[in-house]
Regions:
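Non-catalytic, mostly N-terminal accessory regions of nucleic-acid modification and defense proteins
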Residues: 1-188
Length: 188
């Protein structure tokens, strides 16, 4: 598959095939968009992950408030505005305990990134996916998609998000022009 933004969006949107029957069409975007964002964030953080984890171990021993820890950790992220302190990634979640592992992984993100997942009510959908025995399947498909900056530029990734949001809006029966990229996603 050629990784043009449209082809990539089509591939990502094919997650909807797994959701059919267990989720309403209007809910597909509430699952697909945060998983896409999660995979992109994971790819962006790949280069600084080990440095952040090493620094986090040192900072934890200081018993500082979360805000102070975040300020210190942001210095180790290669000028990124977010980080993740979990040793997990999508490839390490495993099938047993995947719900708890994924929730823990998301809690490892810095506050601003976590707020985006909260906006999507992602924890609720993780539970529903787990109850429907779809969580592992979705994670496996998402993790096979390379959304790192080496594979797809920030501009093209923006186009992918726009296309996914457009499809989500169509599935939600919204009228044209009512969908947009949340500013938090653009800023990240």
């Amino acid at each position: 598959m050629s990784q043009t933004p449209n082809n990539l969006a089509t591939y990502i949107w094919s997650l909807a095939d797994l959701l059919r029957g267990d989720f309403k069409q209007s809910q597909y975007g509430r699952v697909i968009l945060p998983f896409t964002l999660l995979r992109r964030l994971e790819g962006v953080l790949e280069e600084s992950k080990e440095t952040v984890l090493a620094e986090y171990t040192k900072i934890q021993a200081m018993n500082l408030p979360e805000e102070a820890q975040e300020k210190m950790l942001l210095r180790t992220t290669n000028n990124l505005s977010f980080f993740n302190v979990s040793k997990m990634d999508l490839s390490k979640l495993g099938e047993a305990g995947i719900k708890d592992n994924l929730e823990s992984y998301i809690q490892g993100f810095s506050k601003d990134a976590r707020e985006i997942f909260e906006y999507f009510k992602f924890a609720e959908f993780i539970g529903q996916l787990n109850d429907a025995d779809l969580l592992y399947k979705i994670v496996q498909k998402v993790r096979r998609t390379d959304l790192s900056p080496k594979a797809i530029s920030n501009h093209d990734m923006g186009l992918v998000f726009e296309e996914l949001i457009r499809r989500f809006a169509e599935g939600s029966n919204e009228t044209a022009g009512e969908h947009f990229t949340p500013r938090d996603i653009v800023r990240l």
